[in-house]
Design a protein with these regions (language model features):
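Short strand-coil-strand connectors
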Residues: 9, 20-22, 74-76
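Solvent-exposed beta-strand/loop surfaces of large extracellular or lumenal domains
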Residues: 12-38, 57-63
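Short, glycine- and charge-enriched coil/turn segments that flank and shape catalytic ligand pockets
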Residues: 1, 21-25, 113, 117
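C-terminal beta-rich recognition modules with glycine/proline-rich loops and embedded aromatic residues
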Residues: 50-175
Length: 175
């Protein structure tokens, strides 16, 4: 007999393990722990560990001042980002994500490599009267509009058109 120890990553809020005498649901309490499975027959061992890759907002400690009021989007172990080519905003600085947004996983291809992108709606600020060359100016708020945006896995960025990339997004808290 052999003890097989499988690590359940900290991001795994739920899942299922089956095989070698184990058959149980995993919960958030299992995240960041090891599962100990006693394997009696190594020749016929078949263990399946399925982890649910839920989409989540991740925030940094407030001591990381550059990210206060912002969040990154993660799915399982993957961090997602946005590139200029995937939005209608004139700059990624104008994008806000809705805390209650619904993300839709879609199959996507970059440079012949298939991956799962996330599609959602973004809030974009109307800055038509904004002087991007002025260091200071009066605040002129003309509202926000919702538009389609695609997020791709961070590992895949910078393989298409030249432009901006962003991981941390300000959050548009709506009531």
């Amino acid at each position: 007999p052999v003890h097989l120890r499988l690590r359940v990553p900290g991001w795994a809020a739920c899942g299922h393990i089956k095989g070698a005498g184990a058959d149980r649901e995993l919960t958030a309490a299992d995240a960041g722990t090891y599962l100990d499975i006693l394997v009696e027959d190594l020749q016929n061992m078949d263990v399946q560990l399925n982890l649910d890759m839920k989409i989540r907002y991740t925030v940094a400690n407030n001591m990381v001042e550059e990210t206060v009021g912002q969040a990154a989007i993660e799915r399982g172990p993957l961090v997602y980002c946005c590139e200029s080519v995937d939005t209608h905003a004139s700059t990624l600085d104008d994008i806000y994500l809705d805390l209650n947004a619904e993300f839709v996983p879609v199959e996507f291809e970059i440079e012949g490599r298939k991956m799962t992108a996330l599609e959602t709606e973004e809030y974009t600020i109307d800055r038509s009267e904004f002087d991007r060359n002025a260091l200071y100016q009066p605040l002129k708020y003309h509202g926000m509009s919702k538009k389609h945006v695609r997020l791709i896995p961070y590992y895949a960025w910078d393989n298409r058109d030249y432009g901006e990339m962003r991981i941390w997004f300000p959050i548009a808290y709506t009531v």
